[in-house]
């Protein structure tokens, strides 16, 4: 079984990350997308998790469709929507086969790109291009190889689990392993791309790289997350993609 078929459910069971409230980060991110687009509009979020960004975007005026393959995640999205007095369309399905409708002015995929191999990434990006309306924009979090190579071996202890960062140098993949106190460890493995590498992936997908927004970085020694750092220090960046 592919690691992604169980990782996110086990991560949520261990940390509750998909059942959390909306964080100011989600509100800020929704505001940034709205400002970049110039106005709210139809928006698709892939890998919506518990719907925190989905609801933040809806509160910013977007008409949001949330697509998440993990069963049950849509329930929390709908719960958040009710709590905040808004409505969204929450769908459960595979990104590679589901039909979320559209077209969309914006497609967002946060913290999950790189699950498969290059051909699978190309296939997904081709689908994203097909979902975009003319003049639409895709916003995709992409993990950087340099951060994960530099911080491989970092370990964080909590009462319930140990978390360890790793890096597969041959496959250029970040590794994020959770080891519960009394259960088998499980690992997330995502393909990392520099902006130059991403540009090599895009031909034939119908998308082109328009901008790069450097992301943040977690400082393991200080135990502090810095939300904005230079690209050469960031854990990930947002690839702003437009139809070619």
Indicate where each model-derived feature is located.
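Short catalytic micro-motifs in class I SAM-dependent methyltransferases
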Residues: 111-112
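Class I SAM-dependent methyltransferase SAM/SAH-binding core
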Residues: 52, 56-97
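SAM-dependent methyltransferase
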Residues: 139-201
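A conserved beta-strand element that flanks and buttresses the S-adenosyl-L-methionine
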Residues: 108
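A short glycine-rich, Lys/Arg-flanked "PGG" loop and its adjoining helix->strand segment in the class I
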Residues: 122-134
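Conserved class I S-adenosyl-L-methionine
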Residues: 1-41
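C-terminal lobe and adjacent flexible extensions of AdoMet/dcAdoMet transferase-like proteins
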Residues: 197, 201-244
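Class I SAM-dependent methyltransferase "Motif I" SAM/SAH-binding loop
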Residues: 47-51
């Amino acid at each position: 079984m592919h690691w992604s078929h169980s990782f996110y459910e086990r991560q949520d069971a261990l940390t509750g990350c998909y059942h959390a409230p909306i964080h100011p980060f989600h509100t800020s991110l929704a505001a940034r997308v709205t400002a970049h687009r110039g106005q709210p509009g139809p928006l698709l979020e892939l890998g919506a998790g518990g719907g925190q960004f989905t609801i933040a975007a809806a509160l910013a005026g977007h008409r949001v469709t949330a697509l998440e393959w993990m069963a049950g995640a849509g329930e929390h999205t709908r719960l958040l929507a009710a709590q905040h007095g808004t409505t969204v369309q929450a769908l459960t399905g595979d990104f590679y086969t589901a039909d979320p409708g559209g077209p969309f002015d914006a497609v967002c995929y946060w913290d999950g790109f790189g699950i498969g191999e290059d051909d699978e990434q190309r296939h997904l990006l081709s689908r994203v291009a097909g979902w975009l309306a003319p003049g639409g924009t895709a916003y995709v979090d992409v993990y950087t190889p340099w951060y994960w190579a530099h911080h491989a071996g970092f370990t964080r202890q909590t009462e319930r689990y140990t978390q360890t960062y790793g890096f597969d140098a041959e496959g250029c993949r970040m590794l994020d392993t959770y080891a519960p106190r009394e259960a088998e460890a499980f690992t997330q493995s995502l393909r990392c791309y520099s902006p130059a590498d991403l540009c090599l992936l895009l031909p034939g997908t119908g998308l082109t790289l328009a901008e790069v927004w450097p992301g943040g970085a977690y400082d393991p020694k200080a135990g502090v997350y810095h939300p904005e750092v230079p690209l050469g220090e960031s854990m990930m960046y947002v690839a702003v993609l437009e139809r070619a």
